[in-house]
Amino acid sequence: QIQRDGFRAARRAGVKMVFASDAGVMPHAEVGRQFRIMTEYGMTPMDAIRAATRNAAEALGRESDVGTIAPGRYGDLIALAGDPTADVTLLANVPFVMKGGGIVKDAR
């Protein structure tokens, strides 16, 4: 409850949330659970997605080349079986990934 209250208080105060993956406290395959947790704590699915993309790029000072889809930026993409803005848990098990123009995962 303390973590949830702190998360909500930070959001109310205008703190920009960023999805993190390098804490080293959970197995890599479990990192996608953060999307579900963020929405349980009050974020919309799209806000949670932005935390993992645009906000993370801004936090790293890389917003000019990653974090959003735009001409001249790196275009790594994923494909899902449904709409993650309707079911954010889809992002915990991504079946298809393209990186640098090539397919790096295809579990469809």
Residue ranges with predicted function:
Residues A86:
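Small/polar (Gly/Ser/Thr/Ala-rich) solvent-exposed segments
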Residues V97:
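Short aromatic-centered micro-motifs
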Residues A107-R108:
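Extracellular/periplasmic ectodomains of large secreted or surface enzymes and adhesion receptors
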Residues Q1-D83:
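His/Asp/Glu-enriched, well-ordered alpha-helical/loop segment
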